Amino acid sequence: MTRPFVMGLTGSIGMGKSAVALMLREMGVPVFDADAAVHQLQGPRGPLLPAIEAAFPGTTGPEGVKRQDLGARVFGDADALRRLEAIVHPAVARMREAFMIEHMGEPLVVFDIPLLFEKGHGKDLDAVMVVSAPAEVQRQRVLARPGMTVEKFAHILSLQVPDAEKRARADYVIDTGLTLAETEGQVAELVRAIREKNPRG
């Protein structure tokens, strides 16, 4: 059975990563969403709730992890963050492995990983796709979000690898500063090329 070509998908805040992930799904490409996996693990009756509650008492409830409370406990505390990651990361890795097994005959699978470069998650990937748009487009998109401020946006950017560096480290760059149709055309061409090189097995 053919092993899929494994593509990482990433990009800074406001660059259109979610839109590109949706395009890929609509083209029949299996996409593993790392953020969604974490939400599932930490949501109502999530399998990680007992371990998180034991490590950080008072941060979980019937609806799952109390994200603000847990965030306050680990923000600025490197040791606490390491303890949380030691609980979460192995569980996400197991979900990734199950996803790969499920889609082993596919020509292409994509792992949607927001902090791919920041957390060093690129080791098991065949290539990385970065979504990018001009800085002013990014700024307009992000500041249009409910509750977003210039200060919050600046803080988030300070924690992320700069867009220019992501572009330089990418194997493929998708320009999302264009129309949706033009962006979709770029994605479709890339998917077609990979499927031709790595047919379904």
From Swiss-Prot:
- Which Pfam family, any one, appears in the UniProt record? CoaE
Q: Which reaction does it catalyse?
A: 3'-dephospho-CoA + ATP = ADP + CoA + H(+)
One GO term (biological process):
coenzyme A biosynthetic process
Enzyme Commission code(s) on record: 2.7.1.24
One GO molecular-function annotation for this sequence?
dephospho-CoA kinase activity
InterPro entries per the UniProt record, alphabetical: Depp_CoAkinase, P-loop_NTPase
Residue ranges of the DPCK domain?
6-201
Keyword check for Repeat: no
Q: Which UniProt keywords apply?
A: ATP-binding, Coenzyme A biosynthesis, Cytoplasm, Kinase, Nucleotide-binding, Transferase
- CC per GO annotation: cytoplasm
Binding locations of ATP: 14-19
Matches recorded under HAMAP family: Dephospho_CoA_kinase
Q: Could you tell me what this protein does? A: Catalyzes the phosphorylation of the 3'-hydroxyl group of dephosphocoenzyme A to form coenzyme A.
* Protein name in UniProt: Dephospho-CoA kinase
> Which classification does the entry list for the species?
Bacteria, Pseudomonadati, Pseudomonadota, Alphaproteobacteria, Sphingomonadales
Question: Which gene holds the coding sequence for this protein?
Answer: coaE
